[in-house]
């Protein structure tokens, strides 16, 4: 009987922009899959069938009410995926880490999940010289043995190391 592959939850703001989605689906997701992990992708956990009715509504109270219901579903789906993953890979780019990504890092860390931070952004983002990103975000990344890396080759090697733990 074949064992299910270990799961990585991919926390990132990359789904919000076309260029982000291109990197996410052309580089990052394939890299994780190549190592052997199953990807839990928050950008596809909530289906278009749920999203499209809200998108189609004209601006106003009905649209706002619909989105509030959908937002709860999205949050629940993502929380469930974080609970069910073995590892979190969090993209921590930007002048400040995306608030949703930071929340997913903290939630996963509280559940005892290891978190790998990936930062391809060369801009400074830390609170002081002792951290790479916000000190609290970095604390939660490192809490359960995680690390922040800044290049894809190193990320691949880190993922391989973690894969051995879970297979």
Give the ranges of each region predicted by the language model.
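Conserved catalytic or regulatory cores that recognize and/or transform ribose-phosphate-containing ligands
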Residues: 1-167
């Amino acid at each position: 009987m074949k064992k299910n592959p270990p799961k990585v939850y991919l926390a990132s703001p990359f789904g919000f922009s076309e260029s982000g989605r291109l990197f996410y689906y052309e580089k990052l997701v394939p890299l994780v899959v190549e190592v052997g992990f199953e990807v839990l992708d928050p950008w596809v956990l909530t289906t278009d069938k749920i999203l499209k009715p809200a998108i189609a509504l004209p601006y106003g109270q009905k649209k706002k009410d619909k989105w509030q219901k959908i937002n709860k579903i999205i949050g629940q789906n993502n929380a469930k995926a974080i609970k069910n993953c073995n590892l979190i890979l969090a993209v921590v780019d930007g002048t400040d880490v995306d608030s949703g990504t930071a929340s997913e890092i903290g939630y996963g860390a509280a559940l005892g999940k290891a978190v790998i931070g990936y930062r391809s952004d060369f801009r400074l983002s830390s609170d002081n010289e002792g951290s790479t990103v916000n000190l609290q975000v970095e604390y939660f990344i490192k809490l359960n043995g995680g690390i922040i890396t800044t290049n894809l080759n190193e990320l691949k090697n880190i993922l391989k190391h973690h894969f051995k733990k879970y297979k």
